[in-house]
Swiss-Prot record:
InterPro entries linked to this entry: Enolase-ppase_E1, HAD-like_sf, HAD-SF_hydro_IA, HAD_sf
Co-factor note (free text): Binds 1 Mg(2+) ion per subunit.
Designated name of the protein: Enolase-phosphatase E1
Organism: Shewanella halifaxensis (strain HAW-EB4)
Assembly notes: Monomer.
Protein family (similarity comment): Belongs to the HAD-like hydrolase superfamily. MasA/MtnC family.
C-alpha cells in the first residue's frame, strides 16, 4: 500500500518562517485596529469578535479591549481560530494591494508538478486559516499554485500537535493512514501524526533546528515517494 497523498505544513516547510514572522504577523498587527473599526459590523468579523470575547472569558469586552487581546495573541503566536480568521482577512487586503507576495520555497514549487504527474494528492495543514493558505499559494512568485492542491486544513480540523487532528484528516480524505505522508518541521506535529498512523518526514531547513528520531530532509528534492 503506497503513498497516495502528501500533507504539508506551511511555515518552516513550504514557506520561510521569516516571511510569516517578519512580514505577515507585523502587517496584521499594524492593520488590526483600523480593520476592526471599519469592519466590526461585517457578519464574519462580528462572529470573530464574539469568539474572542468567549475565549478570553470577557463577554462584555469593548472593541478596544478585543483589539488589545488580539494584539497580545499575535505576540504570543496563539493558534486561536478567530485570530487566524481575522489575520487572513487582513492579509487578503495586503496581497490585493501588492504589499507583499507569498513566499514559497522553490524546491516545493518544483516538487508540486512531480506529485501531480505521479497522481498524488496534495494538501496543506496550517494553523493559519484555509483562506490565508489559499492567499499564500495564489500570490506566490511562481503565480497561483492553488490548482495543484486537493485541499487545505486549518485549526477547525484540530490542533496540529494532537493526534485527533490527523485522524480527522484521514477521515476527510478517505484514505488509510499509511497512504498519507505528512511533512513538517515541528517535532510535536510529527509525533501526533505518527500516533495517528501517518508516515512522517521532518523538514530541516535550518541547522539549528531541533530534530528527533524521524527521517529528515532539507528540501523536497530529497523526498522520494
Amino acid at each position: 500500500m503506497g503513498i497516495r497523498a502528501i500533507v504539508v505544513d506551511t511555515a518552516g516547510t513550504t514557506t520561510d518562517l521569516n516571511f510569516i514572522e517578519e512580514i505577515l504577523f507585523p502587517y496584521s498587527a499594524k492593520a488590526l485596529p483600523a480593520f476592526l473599526e471599519e469592519n466590526q459590523h461585517n457578519v464574519l468579523v462580528e462572529n470573530c469578535i464574539c469568539d474572542v470575547q468567549d475565549i478570553a472569558l470577557e463577554p462584555d469586552a469593548s472593541l478596544a479591549r478585543v483589539t488589545e487581546i488580539l494584539l497580545q495573541w499575535i505576540k504570543e503566536d496563539r493558534k486561536a481560530t478567530p485570530l487566524k480568521t481575522i489575520q487572513g482577512l487582513i492579509w487578503k487586503q495586503g496581497y490585493a494591494n501588492g504589499e507583499f507576495k507569498g513566499h514559497i520555497f522553490p524546491d516545493f514549487i518544483e516538487a508540486l508538478d512531480g506529485y501531480k504527474q505521479q497522481g498524488l494528492r496534495v494538501y496543506s495543514f496550517s494553523s493559519g486559516s484555509v483562506e490565508a493558505q489559499k492567499l499564500l499559494f495564489s500570490h506566490s512568485d511562481a503565480g497561483d499554485l492553488n490548482d495543484k492542491f486537493n485541499g487545505h486544513f486549518d485549526t477547525r480540523t484540530g490542533n496540529k500537535r494532537f493526534k485527533q487532528a490527523y485522524c480527522n484528516i484521514v477521515n476527510t480524505i478517505s484514505l488509510s493512514p499509511k497512504q498519507i505522508l505528512f511533512v513538517s518541521d515541528v517535532l510535536e506535529e510529527l509525533k501526533a501524526a505518527s500516533e495517528a498512523g501517518l508516515n512522517v518526514v521532518q523538514m530541516v531547513r535550518d541547522d539549528s533546528q531541533r530534530t528527533g528520531d524521524f527521517k529528515t530532509i532539507s528540501s523536497f528534492a530529497e523526498l522520494s515517494i
